[in-house]
Amino acid sequence: MATNLRGVMAALLTPFDQQQALDKASLRRLVQFNIQQGIDGLYVGGSTGEAFVQSLSEREQVLEIVAEEAKGKIKLIAHVGCVSTAESQQLAASAKRYGFDAVSAVTPFYYPFSFEEHCDHYRAIIDSADGLPMVVYNIPALSGVKLTLDQINTLVTLPGVGALKQTSGDLYQMEQIRREHPDLVLYNGYDEIFASGLLAGADGGIGSTYNIMGWRYQGIVKALKEGDIQTAQKLQTECNKVIDLLIKTGVFRGLKTVLHYMDVVSVPLCRKPFGPVDEKYLPELKALAQQLMQERG
């Protein structure tokens, strides 16, 4: 059902203007930039997209704009997860209407929901998605929901679930999931272990830094398919040098600043309460943008 969703999917950033409103022009440029750099698809409205500091209406606007701009050129996954099941269902219905290829939802968080309540939440969203496959989003570090392997196995076998975004450093668990579910579309979620995730059984990945250097991750996929471990390791190391800097600057604002220097994003600001990048990092981020533009050619 979801086999065509395999690949390298950028977790799309959401640009804002100086007044903190959606910057629709920059969003369109960012979609085109990702298409041009050879990304297989976009994961829209997730953690990287700052979904949880946006209104429901804004999240729907983002989905609509991305769908218009992508025009069937790449695969589109709409993250529709909210704490509220009803709001998640509304976004899922919108994703279906706009022509997305799949929906995704993080486990509902903040309140200590039971596992059966998690399952019911996903069933309701799947129903509203009207045939679109569900990508279960497991990110325990941010959601606070620590699913056991048995619980993951249950979620990914719910009717309508076609994939799992596994944002965890537990590569043993990644391998266990792959072993148990050989046909499941399985995404690596942490960019810094992309190559290791593929070796542990992931089909591809969904990541934030793909927005600025997606071709490197495609290079890792190609190298591993050819059995060239040395090249894959080298590319992962180069990616991780960038990630080291972004962790210091704040990942989302750092990425937006790099894209600003690449003339893709007009204003390199995140939605408050996120603050701006510390000015001391601007020279490094500008140099990184120049390096990546030269590398991409």
UniProtKB/Swiss-Prot annotation:
Regulation of its function: Inhibited by reduction with NaBH(4), and by Cu(2+) ions, p-chloromercuribenzoate and N-bromosuccinimide. Inhibited by beta-hydroxypyruvate. Co(2+), Mn(2+) and Ni(2+) stimulate activity, perhaps by enhancing the opening of the substrate Neu5Ac.
UniProt-listed Pfam families: DHDPS
Location within or outside the cell: Cytoplasm
Binding site for aceneuramate: S47, T48, T167, G189, D191, E192, S208
EC number(s) from the headed UniProt entry: 4.1.3.3
PROSITE patterns with a match to the protein in the record: DHDPS_1, DHDPS_2
GO biological process: carbohydrate metabolic process; N-acetylneuraminate catabolic process; single-species biofilm formation
Family annotation (InterPro entries): Aldolase_TIM, DapA-like, NanA, Schiff_base-form_aldolases_AS, Schiff_base-form_aldolases_CS
Active site: Y137, K165
The reaction(s) this protein catalyses: aceneuramate = aldehydo-N-acetyl-D-mannosamine + pyruvate
UniProt-reported outcome of changing L142R: Changes substrate preference. Maintains much of its original N-acetylneuraminate lyase activity, but shows a 19-fold increase in condensation of L-aspartate beta-semialdehyde (L-ASA) and pyruvate
Positions marked as site (Required to correctly position the proton donor): S47, Y110
Principal location listed in the UniProt entry: cytoplasm
Keywords for the protein's UniProt record, in alphabetical order: Carbohydrate metabolism, Cytoplasm, Lyase, Schiff base
Binding locations of aldehydo-N-acetyl-D-mannosamine: T167, G189, D191, E192, S208
Pathway: Amino-sugar metabolism; N-acetylneuraminate degradation; D-fructose 6-phosphate from N-acetylneuraminate: step 1/5
CDD domains (alphabetical): NAL
Purpose of the protein: Catalyzes the reversible aldol cleavage of N-acetylneuraminic acid (sialic acid; Neu5Ac) to form pyruvate and N-acetylmannosamine (ManNAc) via a Schiff base intermediate. Experiments show the true substrate is aceneuramate (linearized Neu5Ac), which forms spontaneously at alkaline pH. Linear aceneuramate can be provided by NanQ. Can also cleave other substrates such as N-glycollylneuraminic acid (GcNeu), but not colominic acid or 2-oxocarboxylic acids such as 2-oxohexanoic acid, 2-oxo-octanoic acid, 2-oxo-3-deoxyoctanoic acid and 2-oxononanoic acid.
Protein name: N-acetylneuraminate lyase
Source organism of this protein record: Escherichia coli (strain K12)
